[in-house]
Amino acid sequence: MTIHYPNGQQPVQHYNTHNELPTPHQSIYAKRGMSLEDEINHSNQYYLARHIAVIHKKPTPIQLVKVDYPKRSAAVIKEAYFRRPSTTDYNGVYRGYYIDFDAKETRNKNSFPLKNFHPHQIQHMRECVAQGGICFAFIKFTELDLLYLLPASNLFKYWDQQQNGGRKSILRTDIAKEGYQIHYQLNPRLPYLNAVDKIIAAKA
């Protein structure tokens, strides 16, 4: 099936083969091949199953262009287009707070390029924060296997500096200083709600 983004680019497809929660005897090392998206989905399943939080990946509406019907009981989508650019990757509810965040990866070792975000994503997060929501970004340095949660307020600061002629990237040292490092564990894979608890405490 061919799916087109609004800007004409082809999408990068991710396949989640980890639909079940891990049992205690499973090794963390067995999951090193998981994508960041899979790791987040896996963690969200853990939180949902234990009634801790309800957070899901956002579906993106598509417009069907070509559909084949090889059988009466089955339809095969041959071509489709995303109707509009996506905002952020995930949203949900935790402790009565609206949660909204995006997940980004970079192969750079020392900085994260701000071009990985789009203006409409930043604007969406600003609007959510203005309504009392909690927004942040997962930023993973894949070559170093380091993952951070950066609160939206810090992301906005660097975004605005870039717009005013500042750096076009965020130094990893600054992300480590202003964000929260997420350490991998067995269950949940990414215990990121611990960092969200700190963001909530700072709001009080």
Curated annotation (Swiss-Prot):
It is found in: Cytoplasm. Keywords: Cytoplasm, DNA damage, DNA recombination, DNA repair, Endonuclease, Hydrolase, Magnesium, Metal-binding, Nuclease. GO terms for cellular component: cytoplasm. Its cofactor is Mg(2+). One of its GO terms (biological process) is DNA recombination. SUPFAM superfamilies: Restriction endonuclease-like. Pfam families: RecU (PF03838). Mg(2+) binds at T87, D89, D102, Q121. Residues 7-24 have a biased composition (Polar residues). The record marks K104 as: Transition state stabilizer. Residues 1-24 are annotated as: Disordered. Binds 1 Mg(2+) ion per subunit. This is Holliday junction resolvase RecU. It comes from Limosilactobacillus reuteri (strain DSM 20016). The lineage of its organism: Bacteria, Bacillati, Bacillota, Bacilli, Lactobacillales.
